[in-house]
Amino acid sequence: MDSADRRIAEAAASIRDHLKAQPEAAETAEGIAHWWVLPVTGEKDLEVVMEALALLEQRGEVEPWQLGRRFLYRAGPALRGG
């Protein structure tokens, strides 16, 4: 696993762990980067967080949810047990 893949995997794990602990949480990609990922991994690159969200979305662990003009991300069916 190269450095970029490792950073994405670490960001994805931080997001997954947060949603397991707070299953009703929903946040923008920017908020996820700042509040959920940065404190755990030190990752500051929004592109890495976006890649992690895309990976988790493919797995059904997160889903985008449009609220007005913004997209929030929340736990997907794989984390909600459905």
Place the predicted regions along the sequence by residue:
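Short alpha-helical segments that sit at the start of domains
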Residues: M1-A26
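Short acidic, hydrophobic short linear motifs in intrinsically disordered regions
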Residues: A25-V37
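Basic amphipathic alpha-helical segments that dock to polyanions
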Residues: I32, V49-R59
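A short, conserved structural fragment
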Residues: E57-L67
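Short, positively charged loop/turn segments that connect secondary-structure elements
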Residues: V37-M50
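Short, cationic-aromatic polyanion-contact patches
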Residues: Q66-G82
